[in-house]
Amino acid sequence: AVIETINREQQLSDISASPYRFQRKDYEPVDTMLHQMGTPIKKCGLVRSAFRPSDDTSTYQFHIPANAMMLTELQSIAEILLSLNIETDTAQKALKIAGEIERAIYKYGVTRDLNGNPIFAYEVDGFGNVLKMDDSNIPSLLSLPYLGFVKKDDPLYLNTRRFVLSDENPYFFKGSAGEGIGGAHIGINYIWP
């Protein structure tokens, strides 16, 4: 059921086709979705995620860190199933989806910092719009090596890390008591441990 749900949310070309709806009567825009569905997306191989790990709504519904985590978990599922020689069709489907996600991350989820260096975007929509930031939750851009998506010395990751830990990231804060990453959920000028 999980792989079918991932595949369904990956194959959307129109968000109104998704069975998932959410609307909260609230005053904070980060707490609910635009017209119960969120912002438009274009099918591109990534899996839709209406919410961030912080439980704030996504600006663009393809969350790159979550997609990276999903592909590594799909690869792990396939490895386990194949090693046990069970559910080989499910394993092959998981590997196919993981491959599609990986290609889409590198095609749609890579952008440039202010110096022109390639970095991973935080969120994208498939139309070419990107959100350049990071949030201190996991999965996050900083956690990509921890998730097993990239090596910690990968040049693209190192560029992304430099971006995330700089004032180019709107949620990187520096003060007299410390510096670090926060997020929209906690607000401006707050870091999360």
Regions found by a protein language model. Give the residues of each.
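Active-site acid/base region of carbohydrate-active enzymes
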Residues: 1-59
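Residue-level preference for alpha-helix termini and adjacent loops
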Residues: 46, 50, 61-63, 141, ...
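Short, well-ordered coil↔helix boundary/capping segments
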Residues: 64, 138, 154, 184-191
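Short glycine/proline-enriched loop/turn "hinge" motifs that connect secondary-structure elements
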Residues: 39, 63, 178-182
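An acidic intrinsically disordered interaction segment
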Residues: 23-43, 106-109, 153-167
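Active-site-adjacent structural elements in folded domains
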Residues: 53-58, 122-132, 174-185
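Generic long, charged, amphipathic alpha-helical segments
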Residues: 165-193
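Catalytic cores of carbohydrate-active enzymes
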Residues: 3-24, 62, 69, 75-155
